[in-house]
Amino acid sequence: MLDRDGFRPNVGIILLNQRNQVFWGKRIRTHSWQFPQGGIDRGESPEQAMFRELHEEVGLHPEHVRIVARTRDWLRYEVPDRFIRRDARGHYKGQKQIWYLLQLIGHDWDLNLRATDHPEFDAWRWHDYWVPLDVVVEFKRGVYEMALTELARYLPRQDFRNRFLRSNVRAREFERHMPDGGAPAGLDLPPGGSFDPHPDITSASDDPSPPPHNKAPFLPSQR
């Protein structure tokens, strides 16, 4: 289902823990990390699609989260031609997304990457709010920055430190707002989780590797 400009309707999910760190998932059998996202089916509202994708990709139910905010309008990104199936080129351009900011009100152990028989992720971790901009595949960076920036105003004050990081405030200016001890706190490793200590993306070709069950990203009828 494409709009007249060739963009597929989609939802993106930024899931916060109690420390305002964001869920960051590794796509199954790839080295690519990203936020949960997925297409809006015909007849679905963006919110209905968001809750469906939340369960399919992360294993959470509506009672596990609180909706903090969503983007006001569609945010778009174009997919490079080399990642689009040849028979879709010329009429499919990319994704248009509504982004949701969610607060986890359950526990880390409520997350389940195997909630369905077609998992999207095979590992996950918590990251500080702005870190994904440094590691997401290049053609998604713009839409990630727009979503994170628009939704950052709804973060509790405890994320003040991360805003300095994103603004490239360094040295003395940043240190004035840091607790004694200097470096930002380390990541929480949830029980039973599987983690890649270096989730860096080395090339754009890592991102679009299709997962099983034909849920390949970036195709008009797919994710």
Swiss-Prot record:
Region feature (Disordered): 175-223
Cofactor(s) the record lists: a divalent metal cation
Can you name one GO molecular function term for this protein?
pyrophosphatase activity
Q: Provide this UniProt record's keywords sorted from A to Z.
A: Hydrolase, Metal-binding
Top-level enzyme category: hydrolase
Q: Which domain of life is it from?
A: Bacteria
InterPro entries referenced in this protein's UniProt entry, alphabetically: Nudix_hydrolase, NUDIX_hydrolase-like_dom_sf, NUDIX_hydrolase_CS, NUDIX_hydrolase_dom, RppH
Q: Where is the composition biased (Low complexity)?
A: 180-193
Q: EC number(s) for this protein? A: 3.6.1.-
Q: Pinpoint the Nudix hydrolase domain residues.
A: 6-149
Q: Entry's Pfam families? A: NUDIX
User: Where do we find the motif Nudix box here?
Assistant: 38-59
HAMAP family documented for this protein: Nudix_RppH
The family annotation for this protein states: Belongs to the Nudix hydrolase family. RppH subfamily.
Q: What does this protein do?
A: Accelerates the degradation of transcripts by removing pyrophosphate from the 5'-end of triphosphorylated RNA, leading to a more labile monophosphorylated state that can stimulate subsequent ribonuclease cleavage.
Question: Which PANTHER family does the record match to this protein?
Answer: ADP-RIBOSE PYROPHOSPHATASE, DIHYDRONEOPTERIN TRIPHOSPHATE DIPHOSPHATASE
Protein name as it appears in the record: RNA pyrophosphohydrolase
Tell me which species this is from. Answer: Variovorax paradoxus (strain S110)
